[in-house]
Amino acid sequence: RSGTVGGNICLDTRCYWINQSETWRESIDWCHKCDCGTGADCRVIPNQNTLCVATYQADLAPVLMCLDATIHLASPQGKRSMPLCDFFKLDGMTRNILEPGEMVTHITLPEDASDWSGDYQKLRQRESWDFPEAGVAVLWKGGEGDGPSSLRVATTGLESIPSLHSEEAEDALENWSGLETVEILSESIRKAVKPVQNTWFSPSYRRKMVKVLTKRACRKLLVS
């Protein structure tokens, strides 16, 4: 079997209230994403039926976002393109801006994509093929001194969309001092993510591991 880049980017959001059999859901009531006309409440954050918080768990998006990728769409109505960061929509139901009948045709990278170095680290249940419970991509361009000239960080598996942490990366770049800055950056990314209780690991553990994953992804940066 094989997959596609577009298929990975458009991966449906996951939540253990929706990723179940019909019999299982029927036995304990439905959920906001799969209410089958019952108007069921969100099981993760009750008493609000305005937002589904199912988690986006694809691996490619954070790396491509750090590379400033452009996604290209086509439909019978025409074509359109946008930065990949603008493709996602903070809603576990819709998850992106694709219209009915529209599809991803291709993704392009800027000319300087090969100038970037980086690493991607993920938390998963098994050390094999698996969806990330948390994923962190760190990409950088080498500088003339000890630190990088450019730095980008993005995460996945923690909310309904992948996130590019531009402010945290810019702060780290402006105040670069090696290992100390990596520690500060890792903590700032940990504080920025907002996982909820809808995957295998608890939100608190996933946030703690985001800090660890960010440090791991920065290891090559410290020795490059």
Residue ranges with predicted function:
Residues 1-224:
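C-terminal structural segment of proteins
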